From Swiss-Prot:
Belongs to the peptidase C40 family. A lipid is attached at residue 27 (S-diacylglycerol cysteine). The gene is mepS. This is Murein DD-endopeptidase MepS/Murein LD-carboxypeptidase. One of its GO terms (biological process) is peptidoglycan turnover. It is a lipid-anchor. Coiled coil: none annotated.
Length: 188
């Protein structure tokens, strides 16, 4: 019996391999139209829904990439104080932060002023906001404020009181002053 143990081990090791081979060969059996289940459809007939799923997946990946880039910029600038007209780490204003973010993270040149930035891209309703959209607010009778939407009703911006921060658009101050959103990043 001692001499037969190595042979028995080889046989026992081979049984799972044989079982897997048999199961896998069943997967490669010919599937003709007559032996398909009624609820099974050919892939070609679902091209449009598959394309829609692929488009949704690609949009999700792009949104994750856009948010990641914006958050990288935020991490680099978090807490930098506000300075009207500023565009450096010694102090930056809202439009300067937006301009630098889009230049450094997306290679996109936006104008320097909030007034000019609000004319860029296309108008987007609040219910259709996407990560990377510009969100614009009224501040006083002629003042304007701009930030970058990052999802979940949040935006990153250079605030006059706290410097570069993330704020909620649902905070009473911002909710009351929300004006519009602009889409400047293409998703193609």
């Amino acid at each position: 019996m001692v001499k037969s143990q190595p042979i028995l081990r080889y046989i026992l090791r081979g049984i799972p391999a044989i079982a897997v081979a048999v199961l896998l060969s069943a997967c490669s059996a010919n599937n003709t139209a007559k032996n398909m289940h009624p609820e099974t459809r050919a892939v070609g007939s679902e091209t449009s829904s598959l394309q829609a799923s692929q488009d949704e997946f690609e949009n999700l990946v792009r949104n994750v990439d856009v948010k990641s880039r914006i958050m990288d910029q935020y991490a680099d600038w978090k807490g930098v104080r506000y300075r009207l007209g500023g565009s450096t780490k010694k102090g930056i204003d809202c439009s300067g932060f937006v301009q630098r973010t889009f230049r450094e993270q997306f290679g996109l040149e936006l104008p320097r002023s909030t007034y000019e930035q609000q004319e860029m891209g296309k108008s987007v309703s609040r219910s259709n906001l996407r990560t990377g959209d510009l969100v614009l607010f009224r501040a006083g009778s002629t003042g304007r404020h701009v930030g970058i939407y990052i999802g979940n009703n949040q935006f990153v911006h250079a605030s006059t009181s706290s410097g570069v921060i993330i704020s909620s658009m649902n905070e009473p101050y911002w909710k009351k002053r929300y004006n519009e959103a602009r889409r400047v990043l293409s998703r193609s």
